Regions:
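Conserved hydrophobic/aromatic "anchor" residues
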Residues: 43-44, 51, 73, 265, ...
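An acidic, glycine-rich surface segment that forms the CoA-thioester-binding/catalytic face
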Residues: 41-56, 79-116, 159
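C-terminal long alpha-helix characteristic of the crotonase
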Residues: 33, 135-140, 191-243, 256, ...
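Crotonase-fold acyl-CoA enzyme core
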Residues: 103-218
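Terminal peptide-recognition signature
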Residues: 17, 46-47, 65, 78, ...
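Conserved CoA-thioester-binding segment of acyl-CoA-metabolizing enzymes
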Residues: 1-66, 102
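Glycine- (often His-adjacent) and acidic-residue-rich active-site loop
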Residues: 21-33, 38-39, 67-100, 119
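Terminal low-complexity tails and localization/encapsulation signals of metabolic enzymes
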Residues: 1-3, 263-276
């Protein structure tokens, strides 16, 4: 096993970013299926680097974010780390984590979070910055229980959970510290899909499913523009969102892939997209 906090690999147009750490947020020194994958500033810096690496790789069309092992996607920030640093460090730690997750959220490539186990606290905050969340059945729960530590979910948790599931349920979930089953999370649109299978099957199925978003299967510029409209549009007035949508569409009409897609439809053949 690579002795890293964040493992990075690419396979057929997909970048796989894996969180991998012990309870203290240190790199794993041996195989551990129950690793909590807690994060420190060092792991968040490594995650930031991996996001930028995938963003600039023209051969990468889709990003898969997951955790090591079969028990946790991530248990969130290392409590041992938080207990040993100053309030000033904690503030900048949260600020940097916010910047990293915003970078993930704003990356034009589709980000799929493969929730292979519990995603709690900061672990759920990371998952919520992805575009699509898929969980492995019966492998864990999700929640933002920071209230039990006397704090709030300060890495985008209050902002993203409210936007994803609505104010009333998000507020209740955070002030009670409730941990939600994957089934309940799916019912509240926090999780897109729940798949059965062991950890190895789950990862294989995730990669197979994500292959549909790679070239030549999908027009990657169109995927990126759809994501940009969906991410940015809800934060601006509706008429501005419509204007943004028109401009994004206009740029696609001038792309080679739009010409290929329309021609393939007329000619009743499968389109061969190039990302141009």
């Amino acid at each position: 096993m690579p002795n890293k906090l964040v493992n990075y690999a690419t396979l057929d147009g997909i970048a796989v970013i894996e969180l991998s750490s012990d309870a203290a947020g240190a790199p794993l020194t041996e195989t551990n299926d129950r690793s909590p994958n807690t994060y420190t500033h060092e792991m968040m810096s490594d995650l930031d680097d991996a996001i930028i690496k995938a963003r600039f790789d023209d051969d990468v069309s889709c990003i898969v974010l997951t955790g090591n092992g079969s028990s946790f996607f991530s248990a969130g920030a290392s409590i041992q780390m938080l207990n040993s640093v100053t309030p000033g460090f904690k503030y900048n730690f949260c600020l940097h984590a916010n910047e990293t997750l915003s970078r993930l959220e704003q990356t034009s490539k589709l980000v799929v979070c493969a929730i292979n186990g519990h995603a709690v606290g900061g672990g759920l905050e990371i998952a919520m910055a992805a575009d699509i969340r898929i969980a492995r059945k019966n492998s864990g729960k999700v929640g933002l229980p920071e209230i039990n530590l006397g704090v709030l979910a300060g890495t985008g948790g209050t902002a993203r959970l409210t936007r994803l599931i609505g104010k009333a349920k998000a507020l209740e979930m955070m002030v009670t510290g409730e941990l939600m089953s994957f089934e309940d999370a799916h019912a509240h649109n926090l999780i897109n899909h729940i798949w059965e299978g062991d950890a190895a099957d789950f990862r294989r199925d995730i990669l197979d499913w994500c292959s549909q978003f790679t070239l030549p299967n999908k027009a990657t510029k169109a995927v990126g523009n759809i994501k940009r409209s969906c991410q940015t549009g809800p934060e601006i007035p509706f008429e501005y969102h419509l204007a943004l949508e028109r401009e994004l569409q206009a740029s696609l009409f001038n792309s080679s892939d739009a010409k290929e897609g329309i021609a393939a439809y007329v000619e009743k053949r499968v389109a061969n997209f190039t990302g141009q």
